Each structure stands twice: as C-alpha cells, then as structure tokens.
Regions:
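Transmembrane-helix bundle of Major Facilitator Superfamily
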Residues: 1-182, 314-316, 323, 327-329, ...
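Helix-loop junctions on the cytosolic side of multi-pass membrane transporters
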Residues: 177-198, 219, 242-251, 448-458
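Interfacial helix-loop-helix linkers and transmembrane-helix boundary segments
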Residues: 68-69, 73-75, 131-133, 188-194, ...
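Loop-to-transmembrane-helix transition segments
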Residues: 193-202, 266-272
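Phenylalanine-glycine-rich, low-complexity intrinsically disordered regions
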Residues: 184-189, 203-226, 241-245
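12-transmembrane solute porter fold
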Residues: 7-30, 39, 43, 49, ...
C-alpha cells in the first residue's frame, strides 16, 4: 500500500515536532558548563535548568492530550509549537539562571501539547496496517534527537554561543505553524468535558512522583521532602485511578488497560526510556570524566548509538508485520541488557574508545528495535476515539520512565562512586550501567505479554465504552 501525499505531510510535520521536543530534553547537557560561567549559576540552578523542562513536560502531557481532544488536535499542535518557540526565545534572552529555569518550564508546557498530539495525528492519518511503519519512522526521529542532543548542544555552545541552542527552535517553529494548519487534515476528536478532577489528580500525582525522583539525588531518599512528595504523588495517583474508573467521561479510560498489548506496550515504553535516558546521561559523562574527552568530542563519540537509532527504528516498523511486536520488544531489550552489562564489565580509566563501540552498538541496536515496537503495541489496538488519550498516557509514562531511569542509575552511581577523580567516577559507572541493564530486562519481560501477532484487538468492553460522537475540528 502506497503512502499518499497527505500522509507524507503528516508524517514529516509530526516527526519534526517530535524532533524539536525530544532534542530539548538533552541539548543543554553539554552546554551546562558554559551556562554556569555566563549566568554565574550555582550547581542547583544548573540541575533545575534541565529538570524544569522534564518536570513540566512530564506532568502536563495528559493535559495536553485532553486539550487536543476537546479543542482540536491540529489547532492545539500549532498552539503548542508557538508556545514552545516563544519559550525558546525567552531561554535565549535569559539574563540570569532564574529566568532561564522559568522559561524552560514554559518550554516544557509547549512540548506537552506537541508530542501527544503529534503522535495522535500520525496514528489517525494511517490505517492500522500502515501504522507500525509510520510509527517506526516517527520513533527513529525521536530517538535520533535524544541521542543527538548532546552532540548538537556541545557543537553549538562551543562554536557559536549557548543561547543559540534555543534560538535554533524559533525559525523552525515559524515555518512549522502555517504548514501544520495547511497540510494536516482536520482531526476528529471527542466532544466531551475536560474532566477537570482527573486533570488535577493526574497532574498532582505525576508532579509529586517526578519531583521526588528529581530531588532524591540531591537531598536523599529519606528526606522529609522526598518522602512527602513521593507519598503524596502515590496517593493522588491512586485517587486518579479510582476517579477514572467511575467518571462519566474519563480522561484516561481505564478499560484500555484490559488490552494486553496496550498495558505491556506502556510498561515496556516506560522501561525503554528509563534505559535510554540513563545511558545517555552517564555515557556522556563517562566519555568526559572517565576518558578525558571534551563536550563536543564526547557527543561525537555517541554517534554509533545515534546511527543505530536512525537506521534500525524505521526498519523495525517494517519488520513488525513479519516477526511480531513481541519479539522486537523482548529481543531488543534483552540485547540492550547485554550491551549494557558489557559496558559495565569493561569500564575503566584509559579505556580505548574503540573497545566501547561494540557494546554501545549492541545496546543501541536493541533499543532501536524495541522503541517503535513498544509504541506500536500501545497504539495499534486503540479505538479511534481514544487515540489522543492513549498517546498522552504512553508519552507520560515514557517521560516518567526517563526521569526514573536517571534517578535510579544516579542513586546506584552515588552508592559506589563519585566525581572526586576519574577512577571514582568509573567505579560508580559500572554499577549504574548494571542498573540500566536490570531496567532493560524488566521491559523485556513486559514485552513477552504482548500478543504474538502484528496487531491485537481492543479488550472486550473497550469499544462499547468508547463510542462518543466524533466531530471535526
């Protein structure tokens, strides 16, 4: 089956939107030393320069998906791009660290509109038999942006100036907005209430959990602040589930999780991005602190992993129809675990870079096969009326997985090593990669629960519940 012109436009525009959002999750990492000098920022301020984006992005994803369903997916995608670009300009113009942190939080809010709506528009544009292929392209661009962020950030900060890592978003967004409004078809969504109680409970629960995960690395898991926010997040999360089970118009129809493919795909996606973010976070530092490369040099040496994501993720989308999603998810994550354990075993100061390439390629290849398969498993059996909420759920869990991956790997790292010397860093790096491998194996087990065929029907009862009147936006 051929892809028509409209579908190609949808694929291109939604992939660029995903690239913009995903790139900014990592792009500041290699520019932080320069930002610290130019803005006289403290270490805590640098931490929040990264975390403000992750925090607002993670907790507002479900809200973004719900707004798209109520107000129109295409329209709200354009609004999200505009907000993202305005915040990017504010980041570039920030006179101090506080202003930069505030602008990053707003940038995350724009991203929370862009990513779930991009995926829902893409999924709606393709028939079920072509969705796996389209999602493979989309996921490859997303993964490429995550891996390429440190390279681009280091190159721009070193060659031009740090504000340009944010200025780059502005012209892209100005071109994107009219193209989105002109080239993406008017979407169909649910004319339903926004479920404000669900929005408050979901946002509050996610905020508490993400805040605790981020703060625990700095002040300890036993601190009153972490325990309070973690407990509050869990309670609000439980209250959210209870509310959604009885709400007349739920933001997240809980019966979607009766689908094994949807439940397992979301679990695997959570673990996948925990692995990916943990790997990128520590590998970039290992190349600099442990092996002595500069920021740009470290980013460039991540290119083997970047290449696997660019090449294999689209291929995985095509393979799904022949080998099944279950094999791609479980096999890919098992391969990633092998590569991560390999890295942990060979890590040492003075390690020749060429010895690091094979395990990096193995891990990157495994992740590249699993990313589109997990996303496909979560979305392929979803009724059309629930595409927006399903994509918001998947992306929220994926983002929280990234935060969790960095937090758990950092906790393991701090237990065994530190930043006092290259040797101390390497001592902690090995166990951190071991923790990443453990997360990969958890995701591989979840992948075994995906039905062993190309697609799975929605769970009984889901279609009966999800028959709201669809209306064009």
């Amino acid at each position: 089956m051929r892809t028509d012109r409209t579908q190609r436009w949808v694929l291109a525009l939604t992939s660029v939107a995903s690239l913009m959002v995903s790139l900014d999750t990592q792009v500041v990492a290699t520019a932080l030393p320069v930002i610290r000098l130019r803005l006289h920022a403290s270490l805590a301020a640098l931490e929040w320069t990264v975390n403000a984006y992750t925090l607002s992005f993670g907790v507002l994803l479900l809200t973004g998906a719900a707004l798209g369903e109520r107000l129109g997916r295409r329209r709200m995608l354009a609004v999200g791009i505009g907000l993202f670009c305005a915040a990017s300009a504010a980041c570039a113009l920030s006179p101090d660290a506080g202003a930069l942190i505030a602008a990053r939080a707003v940038q995350g809010a724009g991203a929370a509109l862009m990513l779930p709506l991009a995926l829902s528009l893409l999924t709606a544009a393709f028939p079920p038999e072509r969705r796996a292929w389209a999602i493979g392209i989309f996921s490859g661009v997303t993964g490429l942006a995550v891996m390429g962020g440190p390279v681009i950030g280091g190159a721009v900060a070193q060659a031009i100036a740090w504000p340009w890592i944010f200025w780059l978003n502005v012209p892209i967004g100005l071109v994107m907005i009219p193209l989105v409004l002109a080239r993406i078809p008017v979407g169909a969504g649910r004319r339903a209430p926004l479920d404000p109680v669900g929005l408050v409970l979901a946002t509050g629960g996610a905020l508490g959990l993400v805040w605790a995960l981020i703060r625990a690395n700095g002040i300890g898991w036993a601190s009153p602040e972490v325990l309070t926010t973690l407990g509050g997040g869990l309670l609000l999360g439980a209250a959210f589930v209870a509310w959604e089970l009885r709400a007349a118009q739920p933001m997240v129809p809980m019966r979607l999780f009766r689908s094994r493919a949807f439940a397992a795909g979301n679990t695997a996606g959570f673990c996948l991005f925990a692995v990916l973010f943990g790997l990128v976070f520590f590998m970039a530092q290992f190349l600099q602190t442990g092996l002595g490369f500069g920021p740009l040099g470290a980013g460039l040496r991540l290119l083997p992993g970047w290449a696997t994501l660019a090449v294999i993720a689209p291929l995985a989308g095509s393979l799904a129809s022949r080998v099944g999603l279950r094999l791609l998810i479980s096999g890919g994550l098992a391969a990633a675990a092998v590569g991560l354990i390999w890295m942990a075993l060979i890590a040492r100061t003075g390690l020749p870079y060429w010895q690091l390439v094979p395990p990096l390629v193995v891990a990157g290849t495994g992740v590249s096969f699993a990313i589109p398969a997990a996303q496909g498993a979560a979305m392929i059996a979803v009724p059309s009326a629930a595409i927006g909420t399903a994509s918001g759920t998947f992306n929220t869990l994926r983002q929280l997985g990234g935060v969790f991956g960095v937090a758990i790997c950092a906790a393991v790292f701090a237990t065994h090593g530190g930043y006092g010397s290259p040797a101390a860093f390497v001592t902690g790096f090995g166990p951190a990669m071991g923790a990443c491998a453990g997360l990969a194996l958890v995701g591989a087990v979840a992948g075994l629960l995906v039905p062993g065929r190309r697609s799975a029907p929605a769970a009984p009862g889901v279609m009966a519940e999800l028959r709201p009147t669809e209306t064009a936006r």
